[in-house]
Amino acid sequence: MLLSSKNDPKLYDNFEEIGLKSAIKNNDVLIKINLGAYQKNHPRTDMTLLKKVVAYIYNHGGKCAITEGCSGFLTENLITFGFEDILKQYNIKVIDVDLEECDEVISYGEYHYIPKCFQEYPVRIAIPATSKSNDMLYSNNIKLFFGAVPRKMYQLDDSDIPIGVPRPKLHQNLHLSVANLFLAIKSYSEFQYYINGGLAYNENIGEFILSDTFVGNNALELDLYMFHNFFSNCEFPNYLDILKTRTETVLAVDRSVP
C-alpha cells in the first residue's frame, strides 16, 4: 500500500489506513532516521516531519525511541538540528546503534549484525532522507538501514575503500550488501511503516521539498515510486533490481506451493 497527502489531516488519515494508528496504542515505537553531523548537500531526515510523527505517536497512546548510527553523537546531532525541545517534552529515548550490542544474522550468505534492542520495539517506523548525492547511491527506505548497524562490526584491517567510509565491509560489494542488509533486518526486526516527505536532495537540482508526504508498508514499492517520480534523471541503483528479482522469486515459489 502506498498513499500520499498534501496536508496534515490527510497524512493522519493515511497513518490510520496503513494501520499505524492502531499499532502504536500502548506500544513502544522505534523510529529509524538519517541524521549525521551537518555537511553541505548531505541528506538528513526532515525534522519537521519527524516532529509530526513523534507528536502523533504520543497523542495516540504510544511512546517512542529514535535510532541512528552516529558514533555516540546522536543526541548532539538531534539538538543541533532543533530537536531538543521535543526530546525533553516527551522524554524520548535516543539509541545510537554504534553503541549497541547486536545479534548475528546471515542473509544470502552475508553476515550482518543487528542491534538486539530493535526487538524490544513491536512497532518500527523508517523516516529516511530521500536523496541522490554526487558519487553516492540513490538512498531512501532500503539504503536507510546502512546506518542501522554498528560501525565496529563492519571494519576491515586492510581496505581499498576510501577513508571516511564508516562501514567499509559493506562497500566491498555495495549493491549486494544493501539488499542483503535490508533483508537481514526484515527477518530479524522488520520495519512495518515507511514515511517519506519534506526535505530531499537530487544531485541535479540540489535540495528541494517534496510537495506530498508518502507513506506505505512496503519499502521496495515506495523506493521505486520515489525514484521514478523524483529521481528519474539519476542513475538507477542495482540493489533495487536485486530486491525486485528476489521478491519475484519468492512470490513465484509461493504460488507454486499447493
Predicted segments, located by residue:
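Extended, low-polarity segments enriched in aliphatic/aromatic residues
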Residues: M1-L30, G36-P258
